Amino acid sequence: MNVTQAEIGKEYIIKSIETQDEELDAFLFSLGCYSGEVITVISHLRGGFVVAIKDARYTIDKQLAEAIII
């Protein structure tokens, strides 16, 4: 299951990041988005998602959301 399928407001543990793009991996890691970290979907936007990771909120697009396996 990935972030696009997550329920709003529910906490999930990130199981893995599935991408072949090293820049995308590095970007997600810089947000604190890596295996074992808690992620919460705050809302669905047209073409993206607002997620909470640690104590911060981020807007990510569908491509990023699909790469985050929960």
Residue locations for each model-derived region?
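Short alpha-helix capping/helix-loop boundary micro-motifs
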Residues: 23-27
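C-terminal structural segments of small proteins and small subunits
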Residues: 42-70
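Short, acidic/hydrophobic/Gly-rich beta-strand patch recurrent on exposed beta strands
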Residues: 14-16, 30-32, 50-53
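Short, charged beta-turn/beta-strand-edge "cap" motif at the junction between a beta-strand
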Residues: 1, 18-20, 43-48
